[in-house]
Amino acid sequence: MKLVVVQFFIISLLLTSSFSVLSSADSSCGGKCNVRCSKAGQHEECLKYCNICCQKCNCVPSGTFGHKDECPCYRDMKNSKGGSKCP
């Protein structure tokens, strides 16, 4: 019985720590993407793709435009037509 309780406790700790890592990544992406998309004409679409790229690459270039060399993964993601996926 004690072994089951210990196993449950360890699994709970692991799950809790992984959720906190995911939520902190989401919150940092949200803030960076809000800055990145602040001057975009289609703000919601910009945020959608910026967050997708940020979650995959773990970075967002500074500023509202350009500076993609700061984040090669973000820069190199392409859409189905071969254009830049990330704003």
Swiss-Prot record:
The keyword Cell membrane does not apply. It comes from Arabidopsis thaliana. This is Gibberellin-regulated protein 8. GO terms for cellular component: extracellular region. PANTHER family: EXTENSIN, PROLINE-RICH PROTEIN (PTHR23201), GIBBERELLIN-REGULATED FAMILY PROTEIN-RELATED (PTHR23201:SF56). Its main location: secreted. Six disulfide bonds may be present. The keyword Disulfide bond applies. GO terms for biological process: gibberellic acid mediated signaling pathway. Pfam families: GASA. Belongs to the GASA family. It is found in: Secreted. Expressed in roots and developing seeds. Residues 1-25 form the signal peptide.
